[in-house]
């Protein structure tokens, strides 16, 4: 009986961890970019969520009428594309790292690394 010294490649056990990290990062990214800040302005009858004005006889209310950021749904100046570009670059860097650190061969190795395989 011939003994086989070849060691098979280990299965990739990291894909659930990578999938969980990607899901958490996506959730965090969407949470940061989709913040809605409902303001509590006005009185007990009139509420203005994103600014506006009301005039009634002796009462006049103006809230954020001249603020251009009041109507875009976000209180920050960071846009979706400004947040998406770093996420895209980090994802590309991670993909490149995983691509260039993979083994050079797909055959089973004899106890040594595939990079030193002379096939």
From Swiss-Prot:
Ranges that cross the membrane: 14-34, 80-100
Predominant location category: host cell
Location within or outside the cell: Host cell junction, Host plasmodesma; Host endoplasmic reticulum membrane; Host cytoplasm, Host cytoskeleton; Host chloroplast envelope
Side of membrane Lumenal, spans: 35-79
Cytoplasmic side stretches: 1-13, 101-119
GO annotation, cellular component aspect: host cell endoplasmic reticulum membrane; host cell plasmodesma; host cytoskeleton; membrane
Membrane topology field: Multi-pass membrane protein
Keywords: Host cell junction, Host cytoplasm, Host cytoskeleton, Host endoplasmic reticulum, Host membrane, Membrane, Transmembrane, Transmembrane helix, Transport, Viral movement protein
Top-level taxon of the source organism: Viruses
Gene Ontology biological process terms in this record: transport of virus in host, cell to cell
Pfam families to which the protein is assigned, alphabetical: Plant_vir_prot (PF01307)
Keyword Lipid biosynthesis among UniProt keywords: no
Family the entry assigns: Belongs to the virgaviridae/benyvirus TGB2 movement protein family.
Functional description taken from the UniProt entry: Participates in the transport of viral genome to neighboring plant cells directly through plasmodesmata, without any budding. TGBp2 and TGBp3 are necessary for intracellular delivery of TGBp1-containing vRNPs to plasmodesmata. Can gate plasmodesmata and increase their size exclusion limit. To a lesser extent than TGB3, induces host actin cytoskeleton network thickening, which probably plays a major role in virus cell-to-cell movement. Binds ssRNA in a sequence non-specific manner.
Quaternary organization: Interacts with movement protein TGB3. TGB1-TGB3-TGB2 complex formation is enhanced by ATP hydrolysis.
Protein name: Movement protein TGB2
């Amino acid at each position: 009986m011939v003994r086989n010294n070849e060691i098979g490649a280990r299965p990739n056990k990291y894909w659930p961890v990578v999938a969980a990290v990607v899901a958490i990062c996506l959730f965090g990214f969407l949470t940061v970019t989709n913040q809605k800040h409902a303001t509590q302005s006005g009185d007990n009858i009139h509420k203005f969520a994103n600014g506006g004005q009301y005039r009634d006889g002796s009462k006049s209310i103006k809230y954020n009428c001249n603020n251009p950021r009041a109507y875009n749904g976000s209180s920050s100046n960071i846009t979706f594309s400004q947040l998406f570009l770093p996420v895209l670059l980090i994802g590309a860097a991670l993909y490149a790292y995983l691509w260039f650190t993979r083994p050079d061969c797909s055959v089973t190795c004899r106890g040594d690394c595939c990079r030193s395989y002379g096939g």
